[in-house]
Regions:
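Divalent-metal-activated hydrolytic enzyme cores
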Residues: 34, 111-178
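Glycine- and acidic-rich phosphate- and metal-coordinating loops
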Residues: 91-100
Length: 178
């Protein structure tokens, strides 16, 4: 059984487009300062504001979406309650994977995409965009939107690396902190 999604299948799924992908990538990068291999999953409210996010290191080379889904579900459950009680999902999950290698699609990306889609179904979220972050820059799979910065080689400012909130940014809160 192959638990992976090809780019064409992803594009046909009707994943909602990011209104401002550059801002989403910059914000997630600034909040989590990912370096390879790190995944950042975020849940967005209908108004486009980030509700919760989590980042975690992952084992490279995994091409089975089952493992990726389990990791995503584990981290989503820690930062935001499920929305399974709703008839339709209102929050959208976005996944940014910071990895080594070329910026093009890989079978690992396919496993992440399958995992994101399934984790969203099981957590009551809409499946949102899948973004890769490499040394070449970022790329939103299925949308053909990309940029050079931030990238996997981009170093954070000293105050951000210290763990202090950056001026003008709200610290990330889990949904239970409300």
């Amino acid at each position: 059984v192959t638990r992976t999604v090809e780019p064409a299948e992803w594009a046909d799924m009707g994943v909602p487009l990011l209104a401002s992908p550059r801002e989403v990538v910059k914000d997630l990068h600034a909040r989590h300062l990912p370096s390879p291999p790190t995944a950042v999953v975020a849940a967005y409210d209908p108004d486009g504001r980030i509700r919760a996010s989590a980042s975690f290191a992952f084992r490279a080379g995994v091409v089975d979406g089952w493992e990726r889904r389990n990791a995503l579900l584990s981290h989503l459950r820690r930062v935001i309650p499920h929305d399974l009680r709703l008839r339709r999902p209102v929050r959208t999950a976005v996944l940014m994977v910071c990895r080594d290698g070329a910026s093009g699609w890989t079978s690992e990306d396919g496993a992440w995409m399958w995992g994101l889609r399934d984790a969203c179904t099981l957590h009551g979220l809409r499946c949102g965009s899948y973004v890769t972050l490499t040394r070449d820059g970022w790329h939103v799979v299925g949308e053909n939107r990309a940029g050079r910065t931030p990238n996997a080689a981009h170093h954070a400012p000293a105050d951000a690396a210290s763990g202090q909130p950056q001026p003008g940014r709200q610290p990330i809160r889990s949904a239970s902190a409300r």
